[in-house]
Amino acid sequence: MAQLNFGGVIENVMTREEFPLEKAREILKDETIAVIGYGVQGPGQACNLRDNGFNVIVGQRPGKTYEKAVADGWVPGETLFGIEEACQKGTIVMCLLSDAAVMSVWPTIKPYLTSGKALYFSHGFAITWNDRTGVVPPKDIDVIMVAPKGSGTSLRTMFLEGRGLNSSYAVYQDATGKAFDKTIALGIGIGSGYLFETTFIREATSDLTGERGSLMGAIQGLLLAQYEVLRENGHTPSEAFNETVEELTQSLMPLFAKNGMDWMYANCSTTAQRGALDWMTPFHDAIKPVVQKLYASVKSGNEAQISIDSNSKPDYREKLNAELKALRESEMWQTAVTVRLSLIHISEPTRPY
């Protein structure tokens, strides 16, 4: 296993050079991999495993996702089954349902988790907060995780392009003594690039913090705050949007993703440079207490409980659609529609920052 230096901290990382696909195939040659759920992660992981030569079946209830599985080449009665039959046939049960669905389907899955099988997740939620989810696996099975750092669509797209999406991995329970090898083999099989060592609880807490923080929740809050202040001070919608969202997403993010923030600061105008360096600390000091509060809420299980409770309500979908409609119809994101239609994007920024 490779050890990489991340800013002075050494971490264990598994690469495809150390653990080639041929080795993964050998380890899993006698296994039947049952992918349960064909929604977000299911298609990418199942199709990549199949294309990499593993014995894969899919378990999915009738409906739109079942029809998608058929369209993707899974054959009813041969490689596509109901959830119960797939769990019975599978020696490795990959539970790729949504967190809410895992809770409702768990009583169906559990009876088929007989001694020596492996239960696989791509998110630590159900196990980390199993006092709330009720997902308590039998003691005589392996419980493992490979969590791709991106969507199932990205995993599949990158696989077809000959690239790998990085993933984290963890072993929660090793009943057979072979859980680690199975985990890494599956990580390679689904098309991972690097595999980073973690635990179920670390994956779950960092994932929920990221979603509520800089990946989605905080970024919308920050963008909206700046947009509102610009609008309140007489700037037009297009001007406020361009200086808040458009330059960030279309010009700057690809650059600092590739080169780092220090490169960005070194390669912008002196006015932008001085302002960014001066204001990053006040923003950090204002935001960090909010992130600390968020992390405490995640770690305590409060955020998990909120998710469980909201997803369990009969009118959840109706209320969610109303929230998304309000977001979509807000001035900032309606402005986005017009801006995107009217501007011609080019691959490199025309401004110096």
Predicted segments — roles?
Residues A2-G77:
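NAD(P)+-binding Rossmann beta1-loop-alpha1 motif at the extreme N-terminus of oxidoreductases
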Residues R61, W74-T128, P137-S151:
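Rossmann-like NAD(P)-binding element
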Residues Y66, A86, V102, P237-F241:
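Small-residue helix-packing motif on alpha-helices
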Residues Y120-R212:
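Rossmann-fold dinucleotide-binding core
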Residues G177-E232, S238-F256:
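Active-site-proximal catalytic alpha-helix in oxidoreductases
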Residues L224, E228, E232-N233, K258-K319:
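Interdomain hinge/lid region at the active-site interface
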Residues I344-Y353:
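Single conserved hydrophobic/aromatic residue that forms the stacking wall/gate
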